[in-house]
Amino acid sequence: MTDAKYVLCRWKKRLWPAKVLAGTEKSAKNKRKKGYFLNVQILSLDKKIKVKSAEAKVLRKVHIEDIASSLASQDGTPAAPLEELTYRRSLRVALDVLNERQGSSSREGTTPRPPRVKPMEPASWPPKPSLSPSFLEDTAGSPGPTRRERMSQRLSGLPAGEEDLEYGVDHKEGLKRSGGLDAPAMCSASGGAQDREASRKQQADWMTPLGKQGRNPAQGPHSGQRVAPSSEGAGQEDGETGAGPAALCSPPGGRDLSPLDGCPAEHLGLDSGQRPRAHMSPHSPAQLGPAEEAADTRPLEEARPLSEEFMEPSAVNSLLEEDEDDEEPPRILLYHEPRSFEVGMLVWHKYQKYPFWPAVVKSVRRRDKKASVLFIEGNMNPRGRGISVLLRRLKHFDCKEKQALLDEAKEDFAQAIGWCVSLITDYRVRLGCGSFAGSFLEYYAADISSPVRKSIQQDVQGTRFPQLSGGDPEEPVAGSPQGRRPAYRKVLPDRSRAARDRANQKLVEYIVKARGAESHLRAILRNRKPSRWLKTFLSSGQYMTCVETYLEDEEQLDLVVKYLQGVYKQAGCQLLARGHGDGIRFILDVLLPEAIICAISAVDAVDYKTAEEKYIRGPALSSREKEIFDNQLLEERNRRC
């Protein structure tokens, strides 16, 4: 466990990713007991704690994914918003570290082993002014390391991302910064395991200062270039170096290195994106062997992982810290107050004598400069109408006066305003974490907000809310405690109309199916019985303004009228002339009232006089029906105005 760099430990009743610090107890006695402690630091936090090795486990990507899936599917009461954000940020940092380590390990799997190097000679050895062709042949045929190995050795001390170097910087400054040497010497032709270990130590000795001091942009050598001694003039330096100075170490015996030992120009990037011109002579790549040319075309990425092996842990830690500092906070913390009001926004509104209270904008009428808002309450109905207010009376929820408005509301309704703020905060946290996407009203109606809503609905009687209208223009009920919301009462639909329809169905069956009123109607048509409805019909004008049918259901009325039309046709046209030829009017004004009165008398077992009075009174309407009818008239009048 102590060999692991990152672990997963329990802290504050949660599994947190942490980094194992130095100084952890590793005694053999404790290891046998499995009771030694680990010094760890929570990722993305400065908190350092001690945990038992038995309670910690090596951090893996699978653990992070399991924790993330459990967070997305949790249904319990959410933690504090800031703690939730901190925990999720720590998990994200751990996932980034694991991905980075996985990427570096995959690159190291294809990296060739670092070449062996010889001890470097002082830069004071003067190089020869020219190179003979015989020397080139000897060098090309020597069993020394290949060109690609020397290139890897040359770049192994560079940090990742610094392979592209610039030319044009004076080579004397490069000698001063790097201690007079910028490139490793040639590798020995023969060597065993001891030579390899010695070369590794020597290579680390001269590469460590380079990682600390930083690379000079002019340290990349060009193929076929030599370094002029510092005692020579500037003109000789310019002539010898060409596009930029380079530093090559001479082998033992005072020989100069072949131009094959330098790095190819095609692997070094310039600012202008061009390569320095090559010299056609012993320095020209055209005279290189086929093996060297093939190695010259190998990509630079093969040598990149070597640089990661020589990077100090402090450099890696500094890179991680810079990434953490550059992280942007969640968008919910970077809120800027908008200039206009839109549908779904959270606002403050002052209603009557109560303090400013949070509300949701349901609709906006730009032309009238008004908006419909719905106050956030314990028993808020997301489908409520809300109240119409002027836009200038609204304030954005995150305005500058937010804290003052909260303090004012806490004076009388501390518990209620605290619940409203917690509901809004939970909504914004879920938006930022991506666990919910939608408006606030959709969030309130969804199951994801039930834990927060239940916390107030279970104690709605003891929580004091302001008596806000919630869309109803009525004032608070007289006699109720001031500032306390009345108990919620479910309103059942009115069943009076259905009861009357069932009673009238008996009258229809008596008239149509039983034909109980047919003899009474025939007697009236033949003038055997007097009828006040027939007298009114004959003495009235041609047009009637209103007809009382008594039957409220249209299907029942259609059945009775069709039956009366048949009775009227069977009676003949004797009374049709006196009825001005209007059969429909005769049926509705004479036959329909007489048939219904006869049915009421028979079904209710009352005399004709009582049944006639009941017909004239009409159906008995309930108080609920009268109230609904009055409200419909008011809405119609307001719509016309």
Curated annotation (Swiss-Prot):
Bias-annotated ranges (Basic and acidic residues): 194-203, 295-307
Cellular component aspect of the GO annotation: cytosol; nucleus
Entry keyword annotation includes Zinc-finger: no
Region (Disordered) residue spans: 98-329, 463-486
Keyword annotations from UniProtKB, A to Z: DNA damage, DNA repair, Nucleus, Phosphoprotein
Keyword check for Phosphoprotein: yes
Record-listed Phosphoserine modification sites: S156, S307
GO biological process: chromatin organization; DNA repair
Disulfide links within the chain: none
Domain PWWP: 343-404
Chief localization: nucleus
Cross-referenced CDD domains: PWWP_MUM1-like
Subcellular location: Nucleus
InterPro entries found in the cross-reference section: MUM1-like_PWWP, PWP3A_3B_4, PWP3A_3B_4_C, PWP3A_3B_4_N
Any one GO molecular-function label of the UniProt entry: nucleosome binding
Similarity field: Belongs to the PWWP3A family.
Function: Involved in the DNA damage response pathway by contributing to the maintenance of chromatin architecture. Recruited to the vicinity of DNA breaks by TP53BP1 and plays an accessory role to facilitate damage-induced chromatin changes and promoting chromatin relaxation. Required for efficient DNA repair and cell survival following DNA damage.
Database matches in PANTHER family: PWWP DOMAIN-CONTAINING DNA REPAIR FACTOR 3 FAMILY MEMBER, PWWP DOMAIN-CONTAINING DNA REPAIR FACTOR 3A
Oligomeric and partner information: Interacts with TP53BP1 (via BRCT domain); the interaction is not dependent on its phosphorylation status. Binds nucleosomes. Interacts with trimethylated 'Lys-36' of histone H3 (H3K36me3) (in vitro).
Domain notes: The PWWP domain mediates the interaction with nucleosomes.
The name this protein goes by in its record: PWWP domain-containing DNA repair factor 3A
Organism: Bos taurus
